[in-house]
Amino acid sequence: RPLLWKHRDASDLNNRIVHFEAEGGKLEFVGLVNGVDTMANEVWAGDNTSGFAIMNTASYNLKNDTSSLSDREGVVMKQVLGECRTVEDFARLLDSLPRPIGVEANFGVVDALGGAAYFEVNSYEVFRYDVKDSPDGYLLRTNYSVSGRPNEGYGYIRYDNAARLFSRAASERSITPEWITGVCSRSFYHILLGRDFTTDAWVVDQDFIPRRSTSASVVIEGVKPEES
């Protein structure tokens, strides 16, 4: 079944899972919400009763406009979870949103029909990457976009750290939710230094997958075709 991983860094380290009822024609869903967001206006990862799931990573090399509207990723994802049943629904919704959208992010999505993709989105443009087109059978993103400006953004070493872990696990067919949260989200291996710092008593908090701003690690298991 498809797996969607969200390793979240945030200023609010207190996150919670909120259940949203189906109201006003919206779909029922659950989502990851900031602790200080008492009205649950923003969702940072989640899945709905149609088997559609979404997460995002912030991008820092994709914005190419002067619009002041920004940081609307959580608002958009809450809307998406209430309205979208498939990856294609999500693609159509993105096309229909008024411009500027006010986002700069990589949105990862999966559905119950086997769809899985990343959408790299800024306020005016959408770039789509389907997992089915990846020779590895999976896609990874950190804090830059493949379609964005080269050599800008963040998380290049972090990406390589994750790519090393996934490459080995994929060859062994051992990628599971438990492995992702228990190994990947806790890995202190630094690929440039070729060393695992997990057992060190002191280490500079830089370039690892986990960091002091990590607030949550969530893996959403998708639905198989024969499941409801």
Spell out what each predicted region is.
Residues 1-41, 45-46, 50-82, 105, ...:
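C-terminal, well-structured catalytic/ligand-binding subdomain of enzymes
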Residues 86-95, 197-203:
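Charged, amphipathic alpha-helical segments
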Residues 89-108:
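Secretory/export targeting leaders with adjacent low-complexity proregions
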